[in-house]
């Protein structure tokens, strides 16, 4: 399919007169179009769930979550990777984003970078991609050369390939192990895929990373438990998380945190199981750090 034939490049008849609308009418037009994004993403929920279920065992066993894209798609991937690091206590080696053109492309357009097949291969070769890794490749059009080449390279290495695009049956969708294709339709401003397509990508990446982290034991109940107390503020936050998770007092949470040497998951298991440090550590080791599984294992043993 020619680029100008793509749905993402078509004119939107609902916004043809946006340049003549009042400011309120203009933002109402944009808002109405944004409502279509959530519905489009909703149709992809089974595929998103399947991708999460395929990805989290790899991540849980040491695989890396790697985002790849060009332009807006690449920047959104870098952002998701960067944000989930402090949220779930990850390192920059466990999850990161690769964008066509490298770091300069985060703030400037790097000419021709998105068209380079060689650059994609070099970028993934440089991080020593393995079959244990997960590659999330995003391109609104589904045919960006850099992104396609990255996904092809990932397939050759045996890595899990998740592909986001907004065009049905795109080359990216056909190449991915798990294609996720919310068809959001033409943009309010013709071809400006930073709008609905970008919003859809942000929603999908949020779901993917959150789902993988939850399934990998980085969350207990709905609490971020991998907070690392490094100062007064984060120490207070850690105490509150422990207290809420275990329905205990802040004082009891503080004592458990001290016993656990500031390791929040260990402190939670200590309180929930009423065991010793050694027993709590053994439970976490047996469940690969999953707090909920550690608590369940303790219940079975007693």
UniProtKB/Swiss-Prot annotation:
GO terms for biological process: amino sugar catabolic process; N-acetylmuramic acid catabolic process; peptidoglycan turnover. Pathway: Amino-sugar metabolism; N-acetylmuramate degradation. InterPro entries: Etherase_MurQ, MURQ/GCKR, SIS_dom, SIS_dom_sf. Residues 55-218 form the SIS domain. The active site is at residues 83, 114. It catalyses: N-acetyl-D-muramate 6-phosphate + H2O = N-acetyl-D-glucosamine 6-phosphate + (R)-lactate. One of its GO terms (molecular function) is carbon-oxygen lyase activity. It comes from the Bacteria. It holds the Pfam family GKRP_SIS_N. Keywords: Carbohydrate metabolism, Lyase. Specifically catalyzes the cleavage of the D-lactyl ether substituent of MurNAc 6-phosphate, producing GlcNAc 6-phosphate and D-lactate. PANTHER family: GLUCOKINASE REGULATORY PROTEIN. A lyase-type mechanism (elimination/hydration) is suggested for the cleavage of the lactyl ether bond of MurNAc 6-phosphate, with the formation of an alpha,beta-unsaturated aldehyde intermediate with (E)-stereochemistry, followed by the syn addition of water to give product. NCBIfam families: N-acetylmuramic acid 6-phosphate etherase (TIGR00274), PRK05441.1 (NF003915), PRK12570.1 (NF009222). Belongs to the GCKR-like family. MurNAc-6-P etherase subfamily. Homodimer. This is N-acetylmuramic acid 6-phosphate etherase.
